[in-house]
């Protein structure tokens, strides 16, 4: 069993609560993504699971075993860092084998495990090279290889793709997902990038200021956000938030949320707004405009003709309602 359970976990630094009573159950063999802005506490949670940070209150279980007071090396986890953390003077083979050598595993077993990991990660021809002779993507694969040979119960990954360029990030996203399918092990992945979260996770944990805002599948997080934070964090461009009374008196005291792709032209009920900026993004066009003091955007086909003003319409089914004070979703 490689499940991970957090029960009322808190982290306090200098009397400041950084993680505030987090409850989370991560299933065996699940790929779960912790996502949120910088400073939300996602990396702190990961480090507490790893044992690199002490927890102030609560319990962490890996499998059925409480690990609060267990040393990191005895938790049967592997940590993949943002910086790769490779030894520059060692070859790829030596870097991958390092953890096994420290555990005094016999040479034949080490060689077998290194070869297997190199095959999985397409690194066989690079085993005798040093990190400086590799690309960023190859270095990241070496870091993954060092984790694979340990055969851990749980993989912990802290922003592992943030140092790569956009093209490599896309490639490595699919490689990590394939790796998860091959290894059938629990993966806990931290990122600030909502695209990574939506494309990689079986479930997503959205965090803000040390609190879990929502835990759900990517589809549910996108289509059924529980509050304005989740609705605004996931989606590009982000959801439009409009004072309800600007649209209709019946929405007084509410915030109306509308995804940019749901702002359409040519509907039955429409209003005209002055265009601020237009951005062409290949097959799409993003049009920015204001509704009262609310900055809004519409995602339209690139062929849409845009002048000084635009007529926008919205279907009632595409409107989200939020309580203005609590910011929680209102379901009708």
Placement of each model-derived feature along the sequence:
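Non-catalytic connector elements of ABC transporters
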Residues: 237, 249-332
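Helix-to-loop junction immediately C-terminal to a conserved catalytic motif
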Residues: 50
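Conserved ABC transporter NBD signature motif
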Residues: 58-66
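Conserved coupling/switch loops of ABC nucleotide-binding domains, chiefly the family-specific signature
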Residues: 56-59, 109, 209, 319
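The feature captures the beta-strand-to-loop junction immediately N-terminal to the Walker
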Residues: 35-37
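Pre-Walker A (P-loop) beta-loop-beta motif of ABC nucleotide-binding domains
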Residues: 22-33
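ABC ATPase nucleotide-binding domains
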Residues: 70-227
